[in-house]
Regions:
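Post-DEXD/H (motif II) to motif III coupling segment of the RecA-like Helicase ATP-binding lobe
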Residues: 194-197, 202-263
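Conserved interdomain hinge at the start of the Helicase C-terminal
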Residues: 281-330, 340-343
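Conserved two-lobed SF2 helicase motor
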Residues: 152-174, 367-381
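Conserved RecA-like P-loop NTPase helicase motor core
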Residues: 355-444
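Conserved pre-motif I regulatory segment
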Residues: 41-82
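Conserved helix-turn-beta segment of the N-terminal RecA-like "Helicase ATP-binding" lobe
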Residues: 113-143, 344-352
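Conserved helicase motor "Helicase C" RecA-like lobe of SF1/SF2 P-loop NTPases
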Residues: 324, 329-358
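Conserved Walker A/P-loop ATP-binding site and its immediately adjacent core
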Residues: 87-126, 333-338
Length: 461
């Protein structure tokens, strides 16, 4: 399904384009004989936002390298601000300290799965009173928020709104126009809320929605957070350049290299290779899901592959001066395979707490487990895993953003400052696609890791 980076009502009486395309739109219309002298062009400034104070806890002190970023994000004269700060360097804290600097009611836009983490951060940084934070999830909750604002009964300083909730607002407006369920036009929302600042978390994940939020909102200032806005997708890069032009990116923090990367090679016998599926039925492109499914269907292959997956865990996590409290995460593709690998590892390491982390899993697993088995979709982005020493990527993945986000789960080990976090990815040298992905990773990780090493696993699939 194609995504259109514009908006229109179903009756086609209204069309919406990003404000940064205004000059291009005017030139386009004039090329078709439509003169600006025959147009009514209205520049509507946002309503005066509600000024508020945020009670910062006394022990909250930004790091030296965050000070310049906070000043940049807190510049209210800039309508759009972007930070592509690497994971673990405090994007959330920097954005919230900029919020303090701006001192206006703030709306935070994010995926529903990140709400609890943001609430934890807000409550850890500020001494909020009951009612200062409001979470809006679902159409009924949004309608209640709108009605509170209309009745001048809105007290919250921070309003958290999930992406899907905003999506429904835009969808229903495009279908029903002004006569919609919510009783407002989308561009009236921030004016009604008197929110002067919008913070968008992990903007790269639901970028189409974030783009559409821009064309359907009239907010004074926005802060966009991500660690992976660097993309090789040409079209996506063009869309980034429209809504998030490079001149609005903060580039004052040098990349901190503290991870050691290992490519772990293994090979497959010709007999086994003939039994492996490398693509889904009817498709030509490589599918790691098909690869794992074909392995799970054959006991000998499954047993060997499970041991291949265990090898880097034993090598870098268990044998490399393991200490209680240190964690390891393993990324697979299929949830089914996560469960199978979890059970296999439990049989070998009964003394360790080994858990899977997939959809609907409680986030406390990330804090309690010694070894976590997960997927890139579940734990590869925006998850903070304390004391993570080793990350093992079993899935062959090419996409630049996925590789950087997965690498970024590793943070400096505060409790063991002399221990270097290790990132391992498996690579089947008998499969051409895996080899190409390995070459791509070498380029992607250049300048982002201490060094890139290669080792061979003494097992054949």
């Amino acid at each position: 399904m194609k995504k259109v980076y514009a908006g229109a009502t179903r009756d086609r009486k209204e069309f919406r384009f990003h404000r940064n395309l205004f000059k291009d739109l005017m030139q386009h219309l004039q090329a078709y004989g439509l003169r600006t002298s025959n147009m009514d062009i209205v520049d509507k400034p946002p309503t005066e936002p509600l000024r508020v104070t945020f009670p910062v806890n006394e022990d909250v002190v930004p790091r030296d390298y965050q000070v310049g970023l906070i000043d940049f994000l807190g510049d209210f004269s800039l309508r759009t601000k972007v930070t592509n700060l690497q994971t673990g360097k405090g994007k959330t804290l920097s954005a919230l300290m900029a919020m303090v600097k701006i001192g206006m009611r703030t709306a935070i836009q994010l995926r529903g799965g990140y709400v609890s983490r943001w609430i934890d951060d807000l409550e850890g940084l500020f001494s909020f009173k009951k009612g200062d934070i409001l979470v809006i999830r679902g159409r009924d909750a949004l309608l209640s928020l709108i009605n509170m604002a209309k009745a001048d009964d809105l007290q919250a300083k921070v309003i958290i709104i999930t992406n899907k909730t905003l999506y429904k607002l835009f969808e229903e407006f495009e279908k029903d126009g002004s006569d919609n369920y919510y009783g407002i036009r989308p561009e009236e929302l921030y004016d009604l809320l008197r929110a002067g600042l919008r913070i968008v978390d992990e903007v790269h994940e639901d970028y189409h929605l974030s783009f559409r939020t821009d064309i359907y909102s009239n907010v004074s200032s926005s802060i966009h957070l991500s660690a992976t806005l660097d993309t090789e997708d040409v079209f996506r890069r063009q869309m980034y350049d429209i809504a998030l032009p490079q001149q609005y990116w903060y580039k004052g923090v040098e990349y901190d290299k503290y991870i050691q990367s290992y490519a772990m090679f293994y090979a497959t016998t010709s007999e086994s290779l003939s039994k492996l599926k490398l693509s889904e039925r009817g498709q030509d492109s490589y599918s790691h899901g098909a690869y794992e499914k074909s392995i799970l269907r054959q006991k000998v292959l499954k047993d060997t592959y499970l041991e291949i997956c265990r090898y880097p865990i034993q090598r870098f996590y268990i044998e490399n001066d393991w200490q209680g409290g240190q964690k390891c995460i393993v990324f697979c593709y299929l949830v089914e395979f996560c469960v199978v690998l979890r059970d296999y590892l439990r049989g070998i390491y009964p003394e360790l707490n080994i858990r899977e982390f997939v959809a609907e899993t409680d986030e406390k697993v990330l804090k309690e487990a010694d070894i976590i088995v997960s997927t890139i979709k579940s734990a590869g982005t925006a998850q903070d895993i304390p004391d993570l020493k080793v990350s093992v990527l079993t899935q062959a993945v090419r996409k630049k953003e996925a590789n950087i986000q997965t690498l970024g789960r590793l943070r400096k080990l505060k409790r063991w400052p002399n221990v270097t976090p290790v990132f391992v990815y498996l690579n089947n040298t008998s499969i051409e696609t895996h080899t190409k992905y390995h070459e791509a990773k070498k380029e992607i990780f250049q300048g982002k890791v201490l060094s890139q090493r290669e080792e061979h696993i003494p097992l054949r699939l």
